[in-house]
From Swiss-Prot:
The active site is at Y181. The keyword Flavoprotein applies. It comes from Solanum lycopersicum. This is 12-oxophytodienoate reductase-like protein. May be involved in the biosynthesis or metabolism of oxylipin signaling molecules.
Length: 355
């Protein structure tokens, strides 16, 4: 953790994230955009991420599925096979050419999965689910994951992390946030309803998350790992603070590089203090932040970095706009999850600076 030394624009001060020297504290987080046909990154992703890359700026990719059975819908990217690895390479190169630091978020979408092969984890029954692209998908009805299948899940994350490094990413972020996603389903006692060695206590419910982190750390190194949590969002655990604090302590022991925590938007700057005290690495705060409260969080050492999702989506040069206090583009919500490679994706205007 580093204290801020520039009271003028705290978000634009440098920060050392492990071996990475960041020039500002503004993070572009993982945002699902639904533009990777057949779960493979397309060429327009290169322009999209390159537009938002800055020298010494941290970017986290949209969630990439760890395996074929973990994907949420057909137009989200994956990182489980060689074709996907090769497709990610020009995207990563585009960010690196701008001097950016690029982490790949990896996930298993849990009960939201639309697997091509579903025999491992689902019953024969079919359920229906409407996803962000407004299409309705037939899904196998989810059943509790049998504990003897868990090593397969852990190994999927390990291989996906290895593939991400092979594609050129600087590190990976494990998605353990809420929304029906697998890791959070295990951690949250309001969702996880079966009894085995992964249930009962907080320690048991965090076991899967920590087994995944440890396996990935053994594969690529803990100094290349971040993890995203949202303990106060969605269907909350009965003791969210205790759960998050336990995870923060355990992740510190494993030497994880950063912890990325989503806050409930109505209580920004109030819920991360116990986590801040428990976690010894870099803390990234997220959750409806604007420029002023983001600066306050950095200035008061509440968090080390702040991620801005929709604001960064609509303003590809957001760090520059913050630096010069320029007006911001408004985002167009209707284009968030379309398949269009340009509209609402790469056509947001940059700040025009007079020569």
């Amino acid at each position: 953790m580093e204290a801020n030394s520039n009271s003028a624009v705290p978000l634009c001060t440098p920060y050392k994230l492990g071996r990475f020297k960041l020039t500002h504290r503004i993070v572009f987080p993982a945002l699902t955009r639904n533009r990777s046909q057949n779960n493979t990154p397309q060429s327009h992703l290169t322009e999209y991420y390159s537009q938002r890359a800055t020298n010494g700026g941290l970017i986290i990719s949209e969630a990439a599925a760890a395996s074929d059975i973990s994907k949420e819908c057909p137009n989200l990217p994956g990182i489980w096979n060689e074709e996907q690895v090769e497709a990610w390479k020009p995207v990563v190169n585009g960010v690196h050419e701008k001097g950016g630091v690029f982490f790949c978020q990896i996930w298993h979408s849990g009960r939201l999965s639309v697997p091509t092969v579903s025999a491992l984890f689902f019953s024969i029954g079919i359920g229906w689910s409407t996803r962000p692209d407004d299409k309705v998908y037939a899904k196998p009805t989810p059943l509790p994951l049998e504990s003897d299948k868990i090593p397969c899940i852990v190994n999927d994350f390990r291989i996906a992390a290895r593939n991400a490094i092979k594609a050129g990413f600087d590190g990976i972020e494990i998605n353990a946030s809420s929304g029906g996603y697998l890791i959070d389903e295990f951690m949250n006692d309001q969702v996880h309803g079966w009894t085995d060695e992964y249930d009962e206590s907080i320690k048991d419910r965090c076991r899967l998350a920590l087994e995944i982190v440890e396996a990935v750390a053994n594969e690529i190194g803990a100094d290349k790992i971040g993890i995203k949590l949202s303990p106060f969002d969605g269907k909350k655990d009965s003791n969210s603070e205790a759960l998050a604090t336990y995870m923060a302590n355990e992740l510190s022991k494993l030497g994880v590089l950063y912890l990325h925590v989503m806050e409930p938007r109505e209580t920004v700057n109030r819920s991360l203090l116990p986590i801040r005290k428990a976690f010894k690495g870099t803390l990234i705060a997220s959750g409806g932040y604007g420029k002023s409260d983001g600066e306050k969080a950095i200035d008061e050492n509440y968090a080390d970095l702040i991620s801005f999702g929709r604001m960064f989506l609509a303003n590809p040069d957001l760090p520059k706009r913050f630096e010069v206090n320029a007006p911001l583009n408004k985002y167009n919500r209707s284009t968030f999850y379309t398949n269009d490679p340009i509209i609402g994706y790469t056509d947001y205007p940059f700040l025009e600076v007079a020569s």
